């Protein structure tokens, strides 16, 4: 990465921090004036009405900062960014169109509420816009041992994977700082990977979202319940999910030679493992118990960890650090152990952790029942 690219990445990172830092207090004020608040409920952990429009600042901040950086490059006649922008114009145009559609869907959902059928249709249209620009999981059939399947199956498989990632990010957003923290880990990982792949325009977008999320994380986690705290809402989680699934698939399209020390598919999947594994477990649980898999409950991993006795803050830190350590450990061991063995180890670890959580919850429930019996 040249000095020019480093300056651009630092500039867009700083601009996003500045824009979000200025915008969020104003969005909070608007939310209180219009009563656009997320009210406490049985399934939710917050105790006071809280603005849920933090995510409405994400896409405008990205587009404004991106435009400023491009404009500066045009004025100063620095050609590196402009050349890469021209070569990647179609996928970039497609992802911004998809982001705008997701943004509109999220705003409607945060203000009026949108059914999951409408969400699924809108998400499907958004991901198809990206796929038809050439962003697809071309090696997914081989990876899943489905090489004999016809070529046309690439499109539905890619669409399914993208919608799955979007909803995984949306559903993990259950406690303060968790979704934004996990996404920061993901964007940092993808940003570094794209630097090694010499795909600096995508590194730029990755680090831009890190800049978007840092001030939001501060307000979301450290803001007091009254007047300072804010949630990202569906607007934010859908925006983050859309960009993450786009960068995820772009990373799998990079030449494997540019990432000699780790399999590109594994690297793309690693930062998203916790939300994706959690969604698979929750959906399986709901189906096994005869419930609609698309209707919310309090059975996500963060809910379960809180029920074991951990605080909300400790749960958030534990899951974010686990994601970062899981990613780092897999990267370090990939050459020695191989992709399939590492993936099997990751799945086994996830199962063991969930079994331990189940045992802890059963023991706590047993203690509670015994104490109630003693009181009677």
What are these regions (language model features)?
Residues 1, 253-376:
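C-terminal membrane-associated helical module and adjoining short loops/tails
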Residues 2-277:
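"…together with the soluble PPM/PP2C metallo-phosphatase catalytic core" -> "…together
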């Amino acid at each position: 990465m040249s000095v020019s690219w480093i300056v651009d990445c630092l500039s867009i990172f700083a601009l996003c921090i500045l824009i979000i830092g200025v915008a969020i207090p104003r969005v909070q004020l608007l939310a209180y004036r219009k009563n656009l608040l997320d009210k406490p409920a049985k399934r939710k952990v917050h105790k006071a009405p809280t603005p849920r429009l933090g995510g409405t600042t994400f896409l405008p901040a990205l587009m404004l900062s991106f435009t400023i950086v491009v404009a500066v490059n045009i004025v100063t006649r620095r050609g590196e960014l402009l050349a890469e922008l021209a070569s990647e114009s179609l996928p970039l145009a497609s992802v911004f169109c998809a982001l705008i559609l997701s943004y509109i869907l999220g705003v409607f959902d945060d203000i009026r509420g949108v059914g999951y059928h409408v969400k699924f249709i809108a998400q499907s249209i958004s991901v198809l816009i990206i796929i038809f620009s050439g962003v697809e999981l071309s090696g997914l059939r081989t990876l899943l041992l489905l090489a004999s399947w016809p070529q046309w199956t690439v499109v539905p498989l890619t669409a399914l994977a993208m919608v799955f990632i979007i909803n995984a990010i949306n559903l993990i957003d259950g406690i303060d700082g968790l979704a934004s923290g996990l996404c920061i880990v993901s964007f940092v990982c993808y940003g570094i990977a794209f630097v090694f792949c010499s795909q600096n325009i995508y590194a730029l977008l990755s680090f831009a979202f890190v800049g978007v999320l840092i001030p939001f994380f501060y307000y979301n986690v450290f803001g007091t319940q009254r007047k300072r705290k804010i949630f990202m809402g569906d607007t934010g989680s859908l925006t983050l999910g859309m960009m993450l699934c786009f960068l995820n698939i772009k990373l799998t399209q990079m030449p494997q030679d540019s990432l000699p020390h780790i399999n590109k598919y594994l690297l793309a999947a690693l930062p998203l493992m916790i939300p994706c594994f959690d969604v698979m477990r929750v959906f399986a649980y709901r189906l096994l118990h005869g419930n609609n898999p698309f209707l919310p409950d309090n059975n996500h991993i963060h809910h379960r960890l809180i029920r074991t006795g951990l605080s909300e803050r400790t749960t958030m830190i534990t899951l974010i650090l686990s994601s970062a350590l899981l990613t780092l450990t897999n990267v370090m061991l990939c050459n020695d152990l191989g992709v399939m063995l590492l993936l099997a180890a990751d799945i086994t670890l996830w199962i063991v952790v969930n079994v331990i959580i189940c045992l802890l919850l059963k023991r706590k429930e047993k203690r509670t029942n015994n104490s109630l019996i003693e009181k009677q």
